[in-house]
Amino acid sequence: MNKNKQELLKAIRMGELKIMNPISFIIDEICDCLLMDKYVAATTATNLLLEETLKLALIIFDSQGKTLDDDVEFENMYQTEVEHNIEKDLYVNIEKAFHVGLIDDKEKEKLHRIRKQFRNPFSHGSHNEAVKCAQTLIAIANISDVQNIQYKKVPVKNQPLLYYLAKHEFLKRESLRYFLNVYHYIVSLDQKLQSLYLW
């Protein structure tokens, strides 16, 4: 195992989120998956993390720093905010996070890019553009002339065996980077949301 990767994931697990702490269990499970080289599981869990991050951030933002001191029953403290945000899909939540100022225009575009690149293909089974356009080298030989092997570059999109091999290779290369991008947003949102609780 890559020692740098191991140290990085250990540091993330030990990181302290204040406002976004309720989703730490998902972060821990993603770290476990990445440490065990379970790239599909890590990516799928990161998709969940991205969705839950935006929903939680919007619920907290909409509450504008509501605390137990506000004379509200604990179990109903965020009822309105939850009802308003919980059923929204990722696209809508990215747009809303931008509209309320939790993310800027550049972050919004990046989140939409990673939504298209990772969430849709790996949570919904649609084609990933990076993989769909991939090519691979295959060997072509004739059984009667095994010495004459030719190599040909072919697209993977029309051959399920090649497509899924390419998809797996893509996740091996990109799942850690995807998680780190999402984690960066969590830390950034956590810091922004802390300002709601500073008097």
Regions found by a protein language model. Give the residues of each.
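Amphipathic alpha-helical scaffolding segments
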Residues: 47-51, 66-68, 137-143
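Short amphipathic alpha-helical interaction/hinge segments
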Residues: 54-61, 65, 123-126, 130
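Charged alpha-helical initiation segments
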Residues: 1-40, 65
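Amphipathic, well-ordered alpha-helical segments in soluble domains
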Residues: 22-26, 52, 118
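Charge-enriched, short contiguous segments at helix-coil
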Residues: 101-199
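Flexible secondary-structure boundary motifs
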Residues: 59-112, 142, 158-159
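Amphipathic, non-membrane alpha-helical segments in soluble helical-bundle scaffolds
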Residues: 13-20, 36-43, 47, 80-87, ...
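Short, hydrophobic, well-ordered secondary-structure elements
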Residues: 27-31, 35-59
